[in-house]
């Protein structure tokens, strides 16, 4: 196939048009010629999106109608960079959970218990995003709760039944669908016991919340009002069985690496023991050695940890991983901003050293991947403010100096590029 791109001048009779959307060669970046038809770059991208969606829906399923672990991890790889071990653990756990539900109707002497999941990793390493992506792959209702807002029933704050209410809302009040959903509880490290010593003051937002979560995580019939909380006691309650709801808990657990290291030091005493200074090891490397007893020392009660038998630890993201996150996934930040600029018919490009500088700044802020968007917003703010009123801008280039704040983005105008083409010709 030959590639046809025309200049803005010339006879309109010679202007070529896309056979699919009808746009002229001047309205698109590229026009590709076939034997009798033309297709523009925008239609090619649209076709690719349709094919990707169809591939996702025609995902290979196991005999139980549940996506296989290999298929789950394949889709996760498209959206989440790195964290291979965590993705492997999650794909197996989710596959087994929904396989268990597929066989629940069949009579068996062996009752398969539910395996809820605990995700442990630094801030911004992808815990929440992994849980959201899993729910999309399996196509089940998903809701997220912040553990810091939860309190025991009867106290000011959100009670745990509100989590089930949110899931029901995500399922459009379809109780059957809600009972097969996924609940992600974030910041569970913030509900650790405040102290090992008993106190006359009740710990309603720490151990009290852990106790309240035990029942719904293990499986109970929760009475949920359709329209929110404890404020309308006269309303008819909906009965939601939480037995088959998959609970995924996540937290950064700041300081947990020190507890693990201290335990490791006790076990590595003696001749021939390899000793590495704690400061030589990254947080993610230390977290790989996590045991349930470490979470007990951190402040989670043993009964709560017992309801979360699958432990997955995530690595802290280094510079290279953050650069990949910026540019490689399907909905990478760079691609998102490029799409925004395309709406103004402007091409946005980043130098490699600019992406590296953005990654460095996120590491300094200690916000992981979560901090990348705020950095990008700051860099592109003035450009996005000016662009709608500027005429003739064809391309915007972001260099390392722009990220550092020592230079402005480079604007390339279509008139200039045409003049250069005419001169060289």
Curated annotation (Swiss-Prot):
Q: Where does ATP bind?
A: 122-129
Q: Which Pfam families match?
A: AAA_2, ClpB_D2-small, zf-C4_ClpX
Identify the InterPro entries for this entry. AAA+_ATPase, ATP-dep_Clp_protease_ClpX, ATPase_AAA_core, Clp_ATPase_C, Clp_protease_ATP-bd_su_ClpX, ClpX_bact, P-loop_NTPase, Znf_CppX_C4
List the SUPFAM superfamilies hit by this protein, alphabetically: Glucocorticoid receptor-like (DNA-binding domain), P-loop containing nucleoside triphosphate hydrolases
Q: Where is the ClpX-type ZB domain?
A: 6-59
> Which residues does the annotation say bind Zn(2+)?
18, 21, 40, 43
Look up the record and give one Gene Ontology term from the biological process aspect: proteolysis involved in protein catabolic process
Give UniProt keywords alphabetically: ATP-binding, Chaperone, Metal-binding, Nucleotide-binding, Zinc
GO CC annotation: HslUV protease complex
> Is Magnesium one of the keywords?
no
This molecule's function is given as: ATP-dependent specificity component of the Clp protease. It directs the protease to specific substrates. Can perform chaperone functions in the absence of ClpP.
Entry-linked PANTHER family: ATP-DEPENDENT CLP PROTEASE ATP-BINDING SUBUNIT CLPX-LIKE, MITOCHONDRIAL, ATP-DEPENDENT CLP PROTEASE ATP-BINDING SUBUNIT CLPX-LIKE, MITOCHONDRIAL-RELATED
User: Subunit structure, per the record?
Assistant: Component of the ClpX-ClpP complex. Forms a hexameric ring that, in the presence of ATP, binds to fourteen ClpP subunits assembled into a disk-like structure with a central cavity, resembling the structure of eukaryotic proteasomes.
Q: Which family does it belong to?
A: Belongs to the ClpX chaperone family.
Quote the protein name from its UniProt record: ATP-dependent Clp protease ATP-binding subunit ClpX
